[in-house]
Swiss-Prot record:
Source organism: Arabidopsis thaliana (Mouse-ear cress)
Protein name stated in the entry: Ubiquitin carboxyl-terminal hydrolase 7
Alphabetical list of InterPro entries matching this protein: Papain-like_cys_pep_sf, Peptidase_C19_UCH, Ubiquitin-like_dom, Ubiquitin-like_domsf, Ubiquitin_CS, UBP14-like, USP_CS, USP_dom
Keyword RNA-binding recorded: no
Region annotated Disordered, chain positions: 364-401
Amino acid sequence: MLTVSVKWQKKVFESIEIDTSQPPFVFKAQLYDLSGVPPERQKIMVKGGLLKDDADWSTLGLKNGQKLMMMGTADEIVKAPEKGPVFMEDLPEEQQAANLGYSAGLVNLGNTCYMNSTMQCLISVPELKSELSNYQSARTKDVDQTSHMLTVATRELFSELDKSVKAVAPMPFWMVLQKKYPQFAQLHNGNHMQQDAEECWTQMLYTLSQSLKLPSPSEDPDAVKALFGLNLLNRLHCQESSEESSETESVFSLKCHISHEVNHLHEGLKHGLKGELEKTSPSLGRTAVYVKESLIDSLPRYLTVQFVRFFWKRESNQKAKILRKVDYPLELDIYDLCSEDLRKKLEAPRQKLRDIEGQKLGLQASAKSSSKGDDVKMTDAEGSSNQSGESSTGDQQEGASPHMTGIYDLVSVLTHKGRSADSGHYVAWVKQESGKWVQYDDANTSLQRGEDIIKLSGGGDWHMAYIVMYKARLISM
């Protein structure tokens, strides 16, 4: 770690710490936070010329206390906050108590609500936070530089959100996100453009899946896939011949397709698991239409569903939005969407779940009272997650392992308000470990009632669900 000062115009920024295990781009992000000069405009003189984003610090000969010179024009569009974050431990005890319960909001840096809402949903996953906290700052050769930088920036952002009681300006994270995915740096008339939250969500999970699956303190070599990934068993049938084939596909989310027939999430999921595609037929020797039917073959700890609300409208040359109301539950059972093999694995945990719930209701559970495929009545989803964040049912037995039941509890909703994906506003609604719901509208946070969360189902110009995340209901066997 080195400490330097930087002279820019008439200002001198004293005692800036440089983490030499991080690339110079991170240092430039620090300077952006202080000066408002974007990294791409920064010209910093070092030994051998200008400081490059991926330079090796050990070759630059920097010394503690050295003064560096920076040139560049500040960005007037987005300015760093004048005051830094206020941390919980710096507040009086009475204020600390008043602010406990949920993390801080995120400052909108200029059409960054898509990013803010995505990160507020992801930070609600304690297992992901644990994996990130164990991630090392020193990059391994198996991770590319920008993926490593984004993973470290995510770790630091989550840490700051947990400590701060005032809204955090995610400037360093945002700069690294744009470095990794330049589409998020697009400008229109000098302003940053609104982006698609689903694209941000998908890119974040992909990046973290690449960096966190490598050798680390984690017991799971592919932690992100274990948390969010599911396997689909795809069966293909050619409509013009008797050809049939099957393949396995790994995905991080399911799609809820919306049509005039779809009124509920479950119906949309069924539509999303069926479709048509064109591919070469070996027997016909030409391209033919195949019917594709998918079944879920493995379940994730956290199930993500995207409502396919946006489509390309040629007349206006932009993404238009389907406003149709599609209801979704606090509690989702996807047993009937699973493959035959997976259903067999779920039968015993589901039966034990029925027995436990029957005992709670003062009833004598019996296997004869319901068939294997019947819907399972569950306790109120508001109280289904224990305080550690583990969605589970039944007493934890020593040595017992948790098993999937195919039943999930809603833990976060990402909504969009507006008529186009390229405009409008994104907001996150996140269930806390206490069972309470909090709305994260950029820097503003507010408590919400659980019954109001399922009203974000669309049908007008109000906030409507675009991405929902459910947590698995587990049972010890």
